[in-house]
Amino acid sequence: MPVLHNRVSNQELRARMLAESEPRTTVSFYRYFTLSDPQGFRDDLYRTLTALQVFGRVYIAAEGINAQISVLQSRFDAMREALYAAHPQLDGLRLNVALDDDGKSFWVLRMKVRPRIVADGIDDPTFNPANVGHYLKAEEVNALADDPQALFVDMRNHYEYEVGHFDQAIEIPSDTFREQLPMVVEMLQHDKDKKIVMYCTGGIRCEKASAWMRHNGFKNVYHVEGGIIEYARRAREQGLPLKFTGKNFVFDERLGERITPDIIAHCHQCGAPCDSHTNCRNQGCHLLFIQCPVCAEHYVGCCSVTCQEELSLPLSEQRSHRAGRENGMKIFNKSRERLQLSLTGEDSAQK
C-alpha cells in the first residue's frame, strides 16, 4: 500500500521543484457538498494527485473540499478530468487559475481532513450553509460598485485587505474568518435594508458569509462569484474597468497577485509605499509583514533589530532563544506593538 503522506524534506522537495524545466500552473478551487467518508475520499484523491505530480494544500471535510494546488501545464487537463471524476458533486467544478503566476507556488502536496474546509466557529444547528446570497458576475459587480445603496464587505483578513481591496469596501478588522462572522453582523446591524456585497479571494469565505448574513436577517445579500480571482479575470476579458485596486494576497509562496499597478500599502518598518509581504528570516519569529527593498537590505530580511541579531547567532543559540516561544502564525496586526519595540531593540528581554 502506498504511503499517503510526504516523507521527503521540504528543502529537497523545493530544490526538485525549482529544477523542473516544465512550467506549472497555480489553481484554486472549492465546493461545498456532503462527504460521508472524508478520510476515504482524501486517500483516494491523494493517490490520484500524487500520480499526476500535483503539489499544493488541500483541506477536506464532511462539508466539502478547499484546495490551492500547482500542476505541470502538460497535465492540467488530466488533473481537471481526475477532479471531475473524483465525486459526482465535483463534475464541472470551477477552477480559478492564478492571475499572476510564476509556477513556483508549491513544492509538496499536503492533504488534511478537518472539521470544516474553512474554520467558521458556527455552532448553530439551525444554520443552513446552502442558503447563500446571489452570485455576481463581473459586470454585475461593477454595477453594484456604482450603486450608493450597496455596501461592499471584505471577508478576508486585515493583512489581505491592506494590500488591495474593492473601492470603498468595508474592512472587518480581524485575523480570522471565525472572528469576522459575528463582527460583520454587529457592524452592519443597521444596514439590513441595503445591498450587501461580500467578497474574498476565491469565493469560499464570502459564500459561507453570505449564508450567515441571510441567517441573521439580511435580505439583499450578494457575493462575488469566484472571488477576486474570477472577477479580475472576467473584467479583463470583457474590457471592464477594474473596481478592485492593488494586489490580491494569496496563501502560497507568491504571497500576492498584481491586479492593478496601484500600491496602497506601506512598509511596516519605514512607511515607504510598498505592498510586498514577506516572512521574517529568523525562523524563530517568521512574522508575516510588509517590507520594502531598502529595509530588507538594512534588516537582512528580518522584522527587527532583535531578530537580525538573533539570526547572526550560532544555530544552537538560536534554538535556545526559541525555546518556550509562542508557536503559530504571527502576523503584523497581532505583533504591531512588538515590532515597534523590536525595531529599537527594546524587546530583547521578551525574546
UniProtKB/Swiss-Prot annotation:
Keywords linked to the UniProt accession: Oxidoreductase, tRNA processing
UniProt cross-references to Pfam families, sorted A to Z: Rhodanese (PF00581), Rhodanese_C (PF12368), UPF0176_N (PF17773)
GO biological process, one term: tRNA modification
Active site residues of this protein: 200 (cysteine persulfide intermediate)
MF terms in GO: oxidoreductase activity, acting on paired donors, with incorporation or reduction of molecular oxygen
Catalytic activity: uridine(34) in tRNA + AH2 + O2 = 5-hydroxyuridine(34) in tRNA + A + H2O
PROSITE patterns, per the entry: RHODANESE_3 (PS50206)
EC number(s) recorded for this UniProt protein: 1.14.-.-
SUPFAM superfamilies xrefs: Rhodanese/Cell cycle control phosphatase (SSF52821)
SMART domains: RHOD
Domain Rhodanese: 146-240
Task performed by this protein: Catalyzes oxygen-dependent 5-hydroxyuridine (ho5U) modification at position 34 in tRNAs.
Family the entry assigns: Belongs to the TrhO family.
NCBIfam families, A to Z: PRK00142.1-1
Protein name: tRNA uridine(34) hydroxylase
Native organism taxonomy: Bacteria, Pseudomonadati, Pseudomonadota, Gammaproteobacteria, Enterobacterales
The gene coding this protein: trhO
